[in-house]
Amino acid sequence: MPDNNVGRVVQVIGPVIDIKFDSDCLPNIYNAIEIDMGDRILITEVEQHIGDDVVRTIAMESTEGLKRGMKAVNTEKPISVPVGSEILGRLFNVLGKTIDEEGEFKAEEYYPIHRPAPTFEEQSVEPEMFETGIKVIDLIAPYQKGGKIGLFGGAGVGKTVLIQELINNIAKEHGGLSVFTGVGERTREGNDLYYEMKESGVINKTALVFGQMNEPPGARMRVALTGLTMAEYFRDQGQNVLLFIDNIFRFTQAGSEVSALLGRIPSAVGYQPTLATEMGALQERITSTKHGSITSVQAVYVPADDLTDPAPATTFAHLDATTVLSRSIAELGIYPAVDPLESTSRILDPRVIGQEHYDVAINVKHILERYKELQDIIAILGVDELSEEDKLVVSRARKVQRFLSQPFTVAEQFTGMKGKFVPVKETVRGFKEIIEGKYDDVPEAAFLFVGSIEEALEKAKTMS
């Protein structure tokens, strides 16, 4: 490497490092810089040119032990991460280094994490439903193959459990590959997920990339791009890939921290002025091409349950389907706590899912909507004051509400109930028969935590 490619650290403020280079070889924006700290090499990424031949960089690892005057080498390329079948079953950090202590790792190919989105000509636009085996999702807010799905919910309503169940179902039922990206979430949850996936064997179809809560903001901001780059490789090889991002809010949050550290004036609610640009650069790369597809499921933490906050609101603009988890449904003991009235999907359309499925979904929504309207009357006057017609609506709605629950495979150890994968045809048939009144005489408790309608009837027999 030529000597004039070497700079010196001139200022360190937490994770922000200013480095002075010769004027004729300033590194490009997004180039990776290596700083030799003796016991380790620290990688930083160029974010700004601030004049006087100084570049401002963000560290991807802890800056502990860093001193002014240390040598910094311009690698002349962005951070590059391993791609290919070798990454399956392994656990990586933002730089593409393995952190699972499972021995030596070698990859044939490396891709830079900053890449252009596919062109219009390359993109595919054929809508097709993606079967998840989770009743409430398949019926009310079906996922599109190659679409972007947002999982919305406050703290502790079950986003991560739902993501784990989806990984499990995709691997077992579709034989599909998944890339799980943990962005700024708890290390303990990542650890639990890793060992659960090892136990169930799902790990061999999955690559995991973690940039957890305790890491510098640079790592949390870039780790989503690392996971996406790995998924893009599989897509370009003709695979249908699932990309899980848990949590996309932490991507925005890390961007906000970095923005403040770089001295940008904040915008609404203290977020970075480049919020929409950063989100767009990530989301536009998640798409289907003529070769394969990336279906992305993104958990979105909603600060203080406020959907108008700029972070979730910006995310909404990019999504094809939303799965909203509701605390009020979780309080009823119904899991997954998906709100059927708040959750939406672009492909809830008879041309994509078929007329029967569409009609049943709309009728289920209608009956639950009516039940919601009647709840105020019930709270004041009691059920007995309702008309016979409304009593029937309430009875069926409560059965529908309970039938939307389902035991999950990944939660077996907590619930003691065997997880269920329900094909979409069975889901549609079950709900159709409930709202037609076929099971008006079956107790509502029989519909709670079962898979198909047959299981509910079996459960009813044991109850009587």
Swiss-Prot record:
InterPro entries in alphabetical order: AAA+_ATPase, ATP-synt_VA_C, ATP_synth_F1_bsu, ATPase_a/bsu_AS, ATPase_alpha/beta_chains, ATPase_F1/V1/A1_a/bsu_N, ATPase_F1/V1/A1_a/bsu_N_sf, ATPase_F1/V1/A1_a/bsu_nucl-bd
Subunit structure: F-type ATPases have 2 components, CF(1) - the catalytic core - and CF(0) - the membrane proton channel. CF(1) has five subunits: alpha(3), beta(3), gamma(1), delta(1), epsilon(1). CF(0) has three main subunits: a(1), b(2) and c(9-12). The alpha and beta chains form an alternating ring which encloses part of the gamma chain. CF(1) is attached to CF(0) by a central stalk formed by the gamma and epsilon chains, while a peripheral stalk is formed by the delta and b chains.
Taxonomic placement: Bacteria, Bacillati, Bacillota, Clostridia, Eubacteriales
Record flagged with keyword Cell membrane: yes
Function: Produces ATP from ADP in the presence of a proton gradient across the membrane. The catalytic sites are hosted primarily by the beta subunits.
Keywords from the named record: ATP synthesis, ATP-binding, Cell membrane, CF(1), Hydrogen ion transport, Ion transport, Membrane, Nucleotide-binding, Translocase, Transport
Record organism: Clostridium novyi (strain NT)
Record family assignment: Belongs to the ATPase alpha/beta chains family.
Pfam families, A to Z: ATP-synt_ab (PF00006), ATP-synt_ab_N (PF02874), ATP-synt_VA_C (PF22919)
GO molecular function: ATP binding; ATP hydrolysis activity; proton-transporting ATP synthase activity, rotational mechanism
Topology versus the membrane: Peripheral membrane protein
Record protein name field: ATP synthase subunit beta
Residues annotated for ATP binding in this entry: 153-160
Name of encoding gene: atpD
Domain of life: Bacteria
